[in-house]
Amino acid sequence: MTAAANGALLNLNDYDSFDGTHSWWNEKFVKNITLFGTDIYVIAGAINIWDDCSIEALIFNKDYIERHGCDDPYQMVFDGEWTIDNQRVLMKQCTADVNGDQEMDDADNWGASGIGIILYSGLYGLDTGITRMNEDGFPELTCTTEEHITKVQSYFNTVMNSDALYQQGINGEKTYYDMFTDGQSALMMANLTSLFGLRNMEDEYGILPLAKYNAEQLDYTGKNNSDFYTCYAVPKSCTDPDFALTALEVMSGYSVDTLDYNLHEILFASKLTRDRESRQVLKILQNTISFDWAYVGDWRGNLVSIYDLKAG
């Protein structure tokens, strides 16, 4: 988007050869990215795979939580009850000082494992974010609102301060990923790219959306990891924009029954998931694709660091 601000990208909506309402473009992404109600400088849809793979989720060890007598998280998801309070209950139930040394580290068992600014990622499940696109097509800060601050504090108190969350580099040097695959954490906070490395995992695993703020929250929400999210743009130096945009339209249109179908129906539905419930959750996750303008320029570095400070 810095390139767009510097005048290096074309506004796709200036050309009749592009139509952002076509079904092969990602509707939620288009809504989030359209500036002033008219300007689109990047686009993503069926032609992309990483928009789907970068969705953030919770991966859980089914065998682990069964051994600890936890309630079925799938059922909580489908009943609309997968909330941060219930996530905390599961995490606490699955945490144990295995060696009895009174110090929780990477030799023990944890309710969840993760790395990075977990608070920042988790709050998107609470139907909030740093920015929102308003009705006039202007991104506006929402992180200063009372609702956002209340939800951040709630996530911090409920999840981050649960004494059941293993944070790589803080509680130990073992990676959060190895903690999960070695059966030492019930949940792994990650994105769907993590599934590619779990095909040989001995324990059974499943997929959950980010937990909601409370049961009254209507939908499961979330975000994409923008470091993985790919999109297409047309540079201002392009000598034939209509040809380039027509090519993008055709390729994305044909990708619906080829690339996109194989990603969802072959790779995700059969090779990377192990149960019917995970496939149902993947449908839920597809609706959580979102773009936060906080990732643009210095907003991400400066604003996101605040959440890192809050997490201590």
What does each model-identified segment do?
Residues 1-55, 208:
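Hinge/lid segment of periplasmic solute-binding proteins
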Residues 13-26, 76-79, 105, 129-150, ...:
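Short, solvent-exposed loop/beta-turn-alpha elements that line the ligand-binding surface or hinge
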